[in-house]
């Protein structure tokens, strides 16, 4: 976009130039609150983020316009001179009723605002300005360069400057100040009180803030790092009466100081009356209020789904279009949102900017950090509507709900086995392929799953970080500690729906339920005998092989089952038989137990 070029159509009298210096000294500049992007950074922003950028820039511009335009102006007529802007049509002022302020076009504000709108790459939008800035419309029937207009204007009209509306949504009187003008409300009473005599203007482009301050701004324009150019009012000399204690900047009046302090970084002056949450921008507060009201004004034309924010609707549209405009330069993977691409790129760079204050663990995305922090706080915000069970993650709730529906949408194409999770199917398919891609660096043993490898690593380190608070017993895995703690509490959370029997572990319940179904899925390849449990099949197969893998360390006797070895070991530890005082026959303590 070419920058707007200023052309001085008449000379400015010396008195006006001197008056300008008195007017502009100490004012806040648009550059102080502007936000810039490089070409590369701008390319990473999606449409929703560009809309947010537009909103922020327009609100900041409305603030600066109020600070610069009318403060310090003299109560006298403006000298006749004009400033025009190339490419910006002259605008005829709509007729206004006597009870309302008359409207006049603003050749100072229009170039700024059209530049900001062009940045968002949203063609076909029309710009509406109220108050001193009047109406800027693309319709040529409103333009009349041959008939210069005459109108009265007072300083208070600058309070109503720079209200933006999208095409097809013209403003109403009730909307003035609703969005971008809210931060300017403090100026209106002072402006009205300090001024009675209106300024007389004879031409559309001769409003006092157009004829003087715009002419001065053209002398200090500055190109930003972005491809577009903005004009920045800047004054480096002059007396400054009010100084900000936060940033040290000075203003020519107290009202300007109040406005300057509102745009300091980190400040959130706009508070929600419902919950007390505060925001830095009024537009953010308006979006937040819809949480309380339940308003969802943005509706998807494809599926009818509604949203509280326009940016969310824009992102949702990509679900239907399948658009993925953001591509990773490293691996070529594409994403529908730029934020997802930024998080993905951290996989390649190894960057982990989000750190947990509790344990110091770092993460690549803020959402992952939030989920992790719930392990410290114990928060479980997701509740099952069927059984009331709580979960830390929404994904865990979705998986859990399949227990109630018995849904297993992921089916193996080779054996027909189905799974409730896609990852479960992927892991199962490795059984058919025989792939074991995860290998232990210590012993060379390989595994089909990374989680199994991680568990195996603890065998080499002998690390047992999970200690029972009741008995002090340590475990390698947290899941085993949880199961162990049920022996102390007596908790049996898994209930059989057939007979009502309870179990401490879920897999024990699964094995038990096979009794009711009669299912014996584990068949012996030698004799065809079937078993309910896989462990029972393994024990049975020893009968055919003759293997006795369990050997006593004291006497060398071997056994086919581990339980047989345990029973045998007790024969080495029990006391020698003693004679009965009644019958004289020897007995052992174990034989005395009924």
Curated annotation (Swiss-Prot):
PROSITE patterns: KRAB, ZINC_FINGER_C2H2_1, ZINC_FINGER_C2H2_2. InterPro entries: KRAB, KRAB_dom_sf, Zinc_finger, Znf_C2H2_sf, Znf_C2H2_type. Residues 569-594 are annotated as: Disordered. The keyword Plastid does not apply. Pfam families: KRAB, zf-C2H2. The keyword DNA-binding applies. CDD domains: KRAB_A-box. One of its GO terms (cellular component) is nucleus. Keywords: DNA-binding, Metal-binding, Nucleus, Repeat, Transcription, Transcription regulation, Zinc, Zinc-finger. GO terms for molecular function: DNA-binding transcription factor activity, RNA polymerase II-specific; RNA polymerase II cis-regulatory region sequence-specific DNA binding; zinc ion binding. May be involved in transcriptional regulation. This is Zinc finger protein 416.
